[in-house]
Amino acid sequence: MVLCLATACTAIGSVGYAQDSGSENKVTMADKTIHAQPSYVLSNSQVELAVTLLGGHMAPVTFYRDTSEPIQPYHISPWQEEKGPEMPAAVLVPLRGDFFCMPFGGNSEALGSEKHPPHGEVASSHWIRKVTERAGSVSHTSMTLETTARVGKVTKDIYLVDNQNVVYTKHTIEGFEGKVPLGHHATLAMSEQENSVHLASSPIRFGMTYPGVFSDPKQGEYQSLEPGKHWDSLAHVPVAWKGQKDADLSRLPARQGHADLVQIYNQPADAHQTPAWMTATFTDKGYVWFSLKDPSVLNSTVFWIENRGRHGYPWLGRNHCLGLEDVTAYFADGLKASVEPNAINQQGIKTALELTKKTPTEIRYIQGVVRVPQAFQVVKTIDFSPGQITLVSPDGLRVSAPVNHAFLSTGNPVRSN
């Protein structure tokens, strides 16, 4: 099995927002326990988010919290309140929402003497909050984690801006040397209504189904897509059964009882450095979830399409979610497969980033939610203007929202005049 993992709250203490002056290995006090996980909380009038101390998983996130119909788009794994056997991987303990992965993937094979847990220590070790603060229109929290499998330090900065239903995230990687696959593991809660979630992305080079066995029947897992197939459109992806029509991955959920993995590769950035984007339009709920990224940093999106297709522990045939995971990686195979020659990097497409001790690397990422009218069924394109994005449907409907997308190049969540 390839491991791609792809609100009741109980207060356990209210911490002040002073910096932690103790050891890097000290676990700071959480604000709340949320779905069984001690969590840090950041909020403003529009958005409230929680980040687990264990693994830095971000969920729940409540957008439009100042309205009568708030939106919580992220998945919380169904075993969070349960007591049971030890999890087969540490990342499964807090599994929820969006989390940073490095090295991204299962990491089942060591690279020389270097061995990492699934999705890396950053997805399953304790993050130490350093500060939560508010300056002007920006609410900000910062936390750090020191790694040992490959020695270094990662700082997670999360920003909320007043009057925006947007989360800005920056991960600063210091002290690391060499190539590594990395990225964000955004995991959305799926609707029960079949074909109600409509997916669209900025232009791609191509897409590919995972070339091996992603869901192994010997382990009570089942997949529906034919392995190792290239394709040009999410709407036409070959299935595993001969004589059957292609799957339309732009319309989900579908094919209940299966778990599949595919990857799409973004076109390189244009001369205007326009962000690459991914969208999921929840037509039954009236909103679009979106992500924005620099395609020269995160050049692909892995789709973890989980529709109750795994029956081993802790899945038990009940997990229903959609991972839209913006990464530079070779599927979810981890460090060794991503840095060595593979079917993707041999085509000139990077499957790992080169890190250096001399210069910190910043991974900047934007996620958010936009309410849309019922007639808005899917995103055809996104128009970018200073401090704003406009979602455009195939019918010409236009919905705008304030988003400081220049953050991807500047690292500043506030638009500069």
Model-derived segments and their meaning:
Residues 2-12:
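Bacterial N-terminal signal peptides
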Residues 18-168, 179-417:
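Surface-exposed acidic/polar loop and edge beta-strand patches at domain peripheries
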Residues 172-176:
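Asparagine-centered strand-capping/turn motif at beta-strand->loop junctions
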